[in-house]
A protein has these predicted regions:
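Acidic, polar ligand-binding/catalytic clefts
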Residues: 1-38, 94-118, 233-236
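Bilobed "Venus flytrap"/periplasmic-binding protein-like clamshell domains
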Residues: 20-77
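Extended ligand-binding regions for polar small-molecule ligands
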Residues: 29-33, 37, 42-43, 48-51, ...
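C-terminal functional modules
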Residues: 175-238
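Short helices/loops that flank or line small-molecule/ion binding pockets
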Residues: 9-13, 37-38, 58, 75-91, ...
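Alpha-helical elements of the RecA-like P-loop NTPase motor core of helicases
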Residues: 53-54, 80, 98-99
Length: 238
């Protein structure tokens, strides 16, 4: 997650946000809970030293709900403890909970509650002092996001490079201008990335969405101009 302590304190250089997540709670469906606020006295598995532990503390304390944290060294250990019923709930990023549910013995017996108790903007980070590499990562991320907005896909990128009259598409695909040179890349850097991986929506669907076992909705990770809109917004290439 892109936080102030990691950015300003630890010195990571974040190149953007590729997934807007939030912390939630995974519980057994048999508990018939409507909200995590009903977990009074419950054992909640969290990873030691993570944002998850602090966020869970804040959530329950602000609602005057007593809970019993079960603190494990790793997220995997917390998931396994939940699977063994050593705790009543498992709290982590919702994407991690969705992944954890797929490896439980009976995934359909577990539900992610609707509560979202934190903001977790996830994205690539690079070491400080390598501005050129940070620019490559940042603008490659923006290129695949912009490609989705402009209707450029893995399948049609080659045809659009030859046929499109839209100057935004032509700049993106390296037909007009030489924007890649600014980051030490070839003119076709964005075209090559899109051909290799697809646009942002295709990457999302394949790894997190309808084509993956997680089957997560786009939610906040929809394009800004979608209906309903999300927070994904590609910076202009010009």
């Amino acid at each position: 997650s892109w936080t102030m302590s990691r950015d300003a304190g630890e010195g990571f250089v974040f190149a953007g946000v590729n997934y807007y997540d939030g912390q939630g709670f995974l519980v057994r469906r048999s508990l018939n809970l409507a909200s995590a606020a009903e977990l009074n006295g419950a054992r909640v598995c969290v990873q030691a030293g993570s944002n998850a532990q602090a966020n869970a503390d804040d959530f329950f304390r602000s609602r005057d709900v007593a809970y019993r944290p079960v603190v494990l060294a790793t997220e995997e250990a917390a998931r396994d403890a939940y699977g063994r019923e050593d705790c009543d709930a498992f709290s982590a990023d919702i994407s991690a909970l969705a992944a954890a549910r797929t490896v439980l013995s009976n995934p359909q017996e577990h539900v992610i509650l609707s509560d979202v108790v934190s903001k977790e903007p996830l994205g690539p980070a690079v070491k400080p002092g390598d501005d050129r590499w940070a620019a490559v990562v940042r603008w490659t991320l923006n290129a695949v996001i912009l490609a989705e907005e402009l209707g450029v896909t893995r399948e049609n990128a080659e045809a659009l490079a030859k046929e499109s009259r839209d100057p935004r598409v032509r700049r993106l695909l390296g037909v007009e201008g030489d924007y890649g040179a600014m980051a030490g890349l070839p003119k076709t850097w964005a075209f090559d990335a899109i051909r290799a991986t697809g646009n942002y929506g295709q990457i999302f669907d394949r790894n997190l969405g309808s084509q993956s076992p997680l089957d997560l909705a786009r939610g906040l990770n929809a394009q800004w101009n979608a209906r309903p809109g999300g927070l994904i917004y590609g910076l202009p290439i010009r």
